[in-house]
């Protein structure tokens, strides 16, 4: 099956939290025989911060938007499946509508949402939102997470079906390595500074650092320059994918903090959770509904509802216990949460549905109702 993808970036994780997800999904689909073309815009400095990885499993097209979009759409229409990811970052509204023109007796079109809470909030905030009327026209809607709340929401908006394809582990890229003294710390957090994350980073990570000056904290990610930090917090800037393992294996514990929108919806384990699991790191996460669907709290993952609970864990979980928890989490991830399993799930969904164009009568009726 030939698959043409529009996404933010496969080649760069710079200001692009979906990079690990894209790589895991498309590399493993390629291993199942899918032929992947991934089109990403030259935007946000990502091409100046490309990761040093092997992307030979996909034909990567770097384009200028909107100039190159008509040419790309012509190529896309020759594929068996066209995927438009949310959050491409440039001309999203144009692409969301334009890809639907590729639908034919041979070509199906999917919308793959990598930030469903933000997408759905945008739709609900504006009754005239252009994407709302397009949802029923896609052959498939996939989401990066969100579980039952997101599935039900998309179905209410007219989606034919909604399939969560959760983040996972790629054991070929995220695995245990020797500790690196330059990243040694008691607690590490890696995440870009974003509007609906910053307050939670202050509430969980920075407040815990303030309360425990005897411990060392490591902060990675873009945007934190100029942010007042406690003296025991060291900021290291953008963390390339190749450094994930060294950080995760050098910290006594690693912290995951979901963005506010993701935490409120639940069922959205981010890439950082599985990156840490692959390295066998001891992970503390903020609480969100659905955690137990992925890992067992207290046995495979630690859960903290506020900074006080984080400081309690820092004081009570020694290096030996941290290693044991990390090893348990890694075993569970390898058994149930790999990208090879997610790719099989996608293939099964695609094979259950035969190609076809949305019935014109159905389309016209929905547009009248919308």
Question: What are the residue ranges of the model-derived segments?
Answer:
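Active-site proximal beta-strand in glycosyltransferases
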Residues: 100-119, 140
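Catalytic binding pocket for nucleotide-activated donors in carbohydrate/polymer assembly enzymes
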Residues: 7-12, 21-24, 37-62, 156, ...
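Short amphipathic alpha-helix
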Residues: 18-29, 203-204, 346
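An amphipathic, basic-hydrophobic alpha-helix
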Residues: 62-81, 89-91
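Short acidic active-site motifs
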Residues: 68-72, 130, 242-243, 309
């Amino acid at each position: 099956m030939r698959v043409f993808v529009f996404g933010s970036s496969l080649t760069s994780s710079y200001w692009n939290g979906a990079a690990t997800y894209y790589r895991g999904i498309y590399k493993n689909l390629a291993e199942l025989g899918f032929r992947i073309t991934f089109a990403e815009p030259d935007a946000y400095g990502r091409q100046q911060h490309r990761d040093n990885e092997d992307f030979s499993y996909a034909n990567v097209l770097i384009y200028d938007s909107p100039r190159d979009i008509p040419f790309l759409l012509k190529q896309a229409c020759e594929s068996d499946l066209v995927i438009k990811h949310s959050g491409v970052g440039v001309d999203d509204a144009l692409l969301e509508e334009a890809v639907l023109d590729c639908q034919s007796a041979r070509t199906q079109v999917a919308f793959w949402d990598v930030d469903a809470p933000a997408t759905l909030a945008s739709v609900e905030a504006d009754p005239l939102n252009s994407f709302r009327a397009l949802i029923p026209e896609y052959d498939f809607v996939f989401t990066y997470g969100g579980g039952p709340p997101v599935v039900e929401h998309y179905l209410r908006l007219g989606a034919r079906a909604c399939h969560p394809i959760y983040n996972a582990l790629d054991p070929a890229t995220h695995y245990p390595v020797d500790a690196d003294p330059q990243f040694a710390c008691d607690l590490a957090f890696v995440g870009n500074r974003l509007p609906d994350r910053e307050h939670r980073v202050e509430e969980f990570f920075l407040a815990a650092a303030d309360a425990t000056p005897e411990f060392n904290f490591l902060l990675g990610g873009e945007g934190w320059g100029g942010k007042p930090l406690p003296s025991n917090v060291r900021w290291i800037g953008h963390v390339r994918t190749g450094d994930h393992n060294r950080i995760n294996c050098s910290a006594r514990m690693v912290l995951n903090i979901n963005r506010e929108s993701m935490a409120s919806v639940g069922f959205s384990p981010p890439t950082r959770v599985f990156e840490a699991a692959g390295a066998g790191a001891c992970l503390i996460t903020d609480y969100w509904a659905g955690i137990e669907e992925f890992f067992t709290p207290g046995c495979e993952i630690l859960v903290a509802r506020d900074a006080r609970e984080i400081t309690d864990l820092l004081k009570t979980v020694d290096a030996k216990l941290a290693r044991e928890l990390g090893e348990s989490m890694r075993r569970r991830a390898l058994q149930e949460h790999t990208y090879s399993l997610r790719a099989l799930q996608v293939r099964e969904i695609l094979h259950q549905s035969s190609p076809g164009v949305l019935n014109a009568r159905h389309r016209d009726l929905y547009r009248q109702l919308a």
